[in-house]
From Swiss-Prot:
It is a multi-pass membrane protein. Keywords: Host cell membrane, Host Golgi apparatus, Host membrane, Host-virus interaction, Inhibition of host innate immune response by virus, Membrane, Transmembrane, Transmembrane helix, Viral immunoevasion. GO terms for biological process: symbiont-mediated suppression of host innate immune response. The keyword Thylakoid does not apply. The gene is Segment-10. It comes from Bluetongue virus 1 (isolate Australia) (BTV 1). GO terms for cellular component: host cell Golgi apparatus; host cell plasma membrane; membrane. This is Non-structural protein P8. The lineage of its organism: Viruses, Riboviria, Orthornavirae, Duplornaviricota, Resentoviricetes.
Amino acid sequence: MLSGLIQRFEEEKMKHNQERVEELSLVRVDDTISQPPRYAPSAPMPSSMPTVALEILDKAMSNTTGATQTQKAEKAAFASYAEAFRDDVRLRQINRHVNEQIFPKLKSDLGGLKKKRAIIHMTLLVAAVVALLTSVCTLSSDMSVAFKLNGTSAEIPQWFKSLNPMLGVVNLGATFIMMVCAKSERGLNQQIDMIKKEVMKKQSYNDAVRMSFTEFSSVPLDGFELPLT
């Protein structure tokens, strides 16, 4: 029994000595020394393009209710500049080339719509003149208006009064043509305004890509230096 106690005491003593050695082997380092070394920031600074894009887009987000077409075109130009500032360099180049390819088609469509609007407008004017003349003729014959020529009274002949039904039909047809032409002209005006706005947006985008960015930084939007002339 005594030998067992001695053996147990020796084991506990050896264990205590081992823990003491392990504790002494640990080196305490100050917290400030244990921190990693501080280096100067080497990462590239974030581009200011998104901030500029947001500022430009803020000008384009104002209310356009009751605004003129010129003001709407101005807001569309601001939006295009903001889009150009926001896009990546490669995406800007792709959009610029696509815009240059679509410009001839847009201008051709715009010219065709303007010619069509001119034809419809002339038809509207002719129909308005016909409707006015037929209305005057019908009204004069219905009222049996008499004219004095060289002191003699001349009334509208009976055969002219018999044309009233036909004149009424012509007047109705001319009025219908006026309504159709007016509606078609309004639709064409909307399409022309939309195409003009689209052309303005694409031209503004291309101008933003091409322009030298010297007003804000030394880097142009194209990603390469532009010669100053």
